Amino acid sequence: MNTFTGVILAGGKSSRMGQDKSALVFKGSSFLHHCKRLLIETGASDIIVSANNKAGVPDIYPNCGPLSGIHAALQQTSHSLLIMPVDMPLLTCEQLTPLVTHTQRTTEALYYERFPLPLFLANTEKVRHILSNILEKKDNLSIRSLIAQLEHEKLPVSNSHFFSNVNTMDDYKSIVVD
């Protein structure tokens, strides 16, 4: 297995939730702690939390969404990145491990069909250059936009339940009840 750095995207404003999503509790631990544990169990050599607070790596390009967090993380390590959002608490190692083990040397981005996150991203000059260009132009600041410009591969999704985002209090209540 390749050496990789785990990245947790936790820099969003959580405006629809009304509070910091990374601190929400699910099955006895915070969303942030759950993500860290998953990345460690998947084999991450290091973990970067992309967040604009004391505990995280700040964005170099502020107010540009998750691409800015990914860009900041790429500057912190020479390893490829396994990137996950803080607000997908149903993810397990079963979804993350194939992203690490199925990568080909020519693949720059590996993700699940229909879901741009979690994402395995090569840390190459080409990837950093393309990402910087997107951020400088501030045109189509989506992860899908980045992926479309890279050599990428999609894995099939067997159960989309694991990829559910928690964006609102209703979303949170629905996963806590399950």
Positions of the model-derived regions?
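Alpha-helical elements of Rossmann-like donor-binding domains used by nucleotide-donor carbohydrate transfer enzymes
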Residues: 34, 69-72, 98, 102, ...
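Conserved alpha/beta core of the MobA/IspD/sugar-nucleotide pyrophosphorylase nucleotidyltransferase superfamily
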Residues: 2, 138-178
